[in-house]
From Swiss-Prot:
Self-association state and partner proteins as the record states: Homohexamer.
GO annotations of cellular component type: cytoplasm
Pathway terms, separated by semicolons: Cofactor biosynthesis; coenzyme A biosynthesis; CoA from (R)-pantothenate: step 4/5
Pfam family, one: CTP_transf_like
GO molecular function, one term: ATP binding
Record's keyword annotation contains rRNA processing: no
GO BP term, example: coenzyme A biosynthetic process
Reactions this protein catalyses: (R)-4'-phosphopantetheine + ATP + H(+) = 3'-dephospho-CoA + diphosphate
Protein name stated in the entry: Phosphopantetheine adenylyltransferase
Organism of this sequence: Azoarcus sp. (strain BH72)
Chain residues that bind substrate: T11, K43, L75, R89
Top-level enzyme category: transferase
Length: 163
């Protein structure tokens, strides 16, 4: 599986230790991993696209074969622009599987030369979601176990400015 470029797309709002774990493991499986940070206007992220790209770059710095790029539009257009051959997706629970399985099937119908590879998180990250991390942070809870210290600082600043 080493040859080729794998694209790990997501909103990453914020970039969690679960995301980082998946990137670390993917970096051992593929020659190159591109973290594709999606604009995701429909989700109304608390961080701007530029902020999310910078946060992700900071977190993935230790992985020499990983780079980060933002995108707006169709994932497949981004994948082609990055010369990607594989879409990486994380699966935490059965609910993730159902949605991701449908997406992988649709992508295979539309783009038969692109594969989707699913990775499950390490046990300690199984229940982390960026949505939960954001909500806990908004309510003043401690999310230090779920994000890197640099992410924590930015997240705390962002939620305190919105109160």
């Amino acid at each position: 599986m080493r040859d080729g470029v794998a694209i790990y797309p997501g909103t990453f709002d914020p970039f969690t230790r679960g995301h980082e774990d998946l990137v670390r493991r993917a970096s051992l499986l593929f020659d190159q991993v591109v973290v594709g940070v999606a604009e995701s206007r429909g989700k109304a992220p608390i961080f701007t696209l530029e902020e999310r790209v910078e946060i992700a770059r900071e977190v993935v710095k230790p992985f020499p074969n990983v780079r980060v790029a933002g995108f707006d539009g169709l994932l497949m257009d981004f994948l082609r622009a990055q010369n990607g051959r594989v879409i990486l997706r994380g699966l935490r629970a059965v609910s993730d599987f159902e949605y991701e399985f449908q997406m992988a099937g649709m992508n295979r119908k539309l783009f038969p030369d692109v594969e989707t590879v699913f990775l499950t998180p390490a046990e300690e990250y199984m229940f982390i979601s960026a949505t939960m991390v954001r909500e806990i942070a908004r309510l003043g809870g401690d999310v230090s176990k779920f994000v890197q210290p640099s992410v924590l600082t930015q997240l705390q600043q962002k939620v305190s400015s919105k109160r």
